[in-house]
Amino acid sequence: YYDAVDSLLTAMKDTTDKWVVRDSLVALSRRFGQVLTPKVQDVKIVTADFLIQNIDSAFVQWREGPWARHLDFEDFCEYLLPYKVEELQPLDDWRTHLRSFHPDHLDELAYCDLYRNSALQAGIKLNDNLWYYMKPGITDETIQLPVYRWRTRLRLPIGTCADYGNIATSVFRSQGIPVVMDFTPQWAFRSLGHSWNVLLAEDGKRMPFSGVCSNPGQPHKLGERMPKV
């Protein structure tokens, strides 16, 4: 299925209307979606070596990386440590794979005393790179059979807020930038809900943003009425 998606995206790479591409992806996923794949609980397949590798990698980013040193242990466990971002995510070495995504742009921050340890500035630069690379198109309609293979997923021209939020969370954590997902299941005045990211800045502020689409520090959905809690 993933190879078929890659082939479709390559064949339609010159198509300027991404919604035409979306319709083709939806049709393709429906065709493959008739094939049911078994779901297995993590506890039955996850290995000690996989968990140890994940813990070691996250711990090095926390203690030795430039953008997570301000986290206490509780925040580290929530914002950086988790071995996966979403359900059905392949249990592979995603941190190492995604760490190579535009690393040179982040390295530039090391030359500025004000920004070299700024999780906020690192997040802005990385999110800008994601936007430039993916050219996101927000849609409420998700494809029937999701794409989880990273080299294919980063090529998709459309996605839901949750799709882009999960992508951003994974890429940010791979670089040692502390980020989580948040959501509201239902808007107060219309159908559907919304998902977004939250970055824990070096000054302790929790800054909402839309992964791939809008940066931390920018106004986020100020025109939307919030439901009562």
Name these PLM-found stretches:
Residues Y1-L156:
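Secondary-structure boundary elements
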Residues C112-N129, I138-R151, P157, A162-V229:
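Hydrophobic/aromatic-rich core segments of domains that either
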